[in-house]
Amino acid sequence: MTTPDAFRDAEYIADVSGISYGNVANLTEQDANVVPRENERMRKLQLAAKVAFIDRLLRDLDILIYCELSALYYMDCSVILFAIRAIVQLIFFTPKAPPFDPTRNQPFIGAIFVSNIFCMIFHNFFTHPEASEATRGYLHGGLLIDFIGQKAPIPLFRLFLLDFLVLILDLVMLGLIVERVKTTGQTSTTSTEILRVQDHDSEERGVHRTRPESRSSVVGAELDETDGHITRANAGVGEQAEHTQLLADPSEDGHTPGAKNSHPLDAFSSGEAVIMNLGLFDVIRDQWKYSTTAPPARTSSYIPSDQTAAFLRARFGLQVGPDGRVQRIQS
């Protein structure tokens, strides 16, 4: 993930986002209503950068798995085993262009374990790569091309080790796909804070109602005195936090904090961002539970136009039902 291509993807996302260095940290108190929108933009930018890094890692792992399959083919010279794994890799794990984005509605667990366990059993009990003197001790095989493999005999432990490595890489790619689906499916969390409009009463009390406040704020006769204490307490806490920030993270000029010159993608560029916390057993359990759960009934919102409905009815005697399925008109 330290290749220039991954950072080029993230830099492109940063360029099109329109977020410059320090434009959020330099906002004043009068621009407090702009901060939530800027925070939402930064959050979307970071999610887009995370998806870009996951896509790059998926492509790199896909190439690595094909290289491992090629190495295994040169050791066992079995087109059947190579084709089984290559087809599974192509269908389930090879990244594809939109709209064929990866989803979790596929039998990943069955495809991974069935294909890899079958190849392991075949290598341990049925395949014994040997070569005769006619081939000078080298393995030959292939249906279309007579590839020359390695020199026989091939240790079974090496075959089993490569089989296990392919299995681990498949599970890692499954974890990345699950994380990508979760990242792209995230929605903006609804804040419990509301934005209130400034009125005359708040203006007389010296309270800024445009600042976000909690829904559980107490409304009563003692509001004036309580708001006064809260305002003074918040002012003291704000001054203390600002003082601590100035002492802890001074900038070069000594007037503004260094955080104002930051960018949402600094963590990705510096390598400090965590793409995902991978636990193989957790990934297997979550995907298995997701696969065994019955999907909810889908209601199609597709409504054909009058011209399309008339054409289907006149030409083929078909109609689109309420569930979106094409049905034959019963005469």
Swiss-Prot record:
Q: What GO biological process, any one, is recorded here?
A: SREBP signaling pathway
The main location is: endoplasmic reticulum
InterPro entries, alphabetized: Dsc4-like, DUF1746
The record's subcellular location field reads: Endoplasmic reticulum membrane
- Report any Pfam family annotated for this entry: DUF1746
Which keywords label this protein? Endoplasmic reticulum, Glycoprotein, Membrane, Transmembrane, Transmembrane helix, Ubl conjugation pathway
Which positions carry the signal peptide feature in this UniProt record?
none
Q: Which residues are glycosylated?
A: N26
Task: Identify its membrane topology class.
Answer: Multi-pass membrane protein
Q: In which pathway does it act?
A: Protein modification; protein ubiquitination
What residues form the membrane-spanning segments? 63-83, 107-127, 159-179
Q: Which GO terms describe its cellular component?
A: Dsc E3 ubiquitin ligase complex; endoplasmic reticulum membrane
Residue ranges for the region (Disordered) are 197-225
Q: What happens when the gene is disrupted?
A: Impairs growth on solid media under hypoxia and leads to triazole susceptibility. Impairs virulence in a murine model of invasive pulmonary aspergillosis (IPA).
Q: What does this protein do?
A: Component of the DSC E3 ubiquitin ligase complex which is required for the srbA transcriptional activator proteolytic cleavage to release the soluble transcription factor from the membrane in low oxygen or sterol conditions. Required for growth during hypoxia and triazole drug susceptibility, as well as for virulence in a murine model of invasive pulmonary aspergillosis (IPA).
The subunit field of the Swiss-Prot or TrEMBL record says: Component of the DSC E3 ubiquitin ligase complex composed of dscA, dscB, dscC and dscD.
Please give the name of this protein.
DSC E3 ubiquitin ligase complex subunit D
Source species of the chain: Aspergillus fumigatus (strain CBS 144.89 / FGSC A1163 / CEA10) (Neosartorya fumigata)
Instruction: Please name the gene that encodes this protein.
Output: dscD
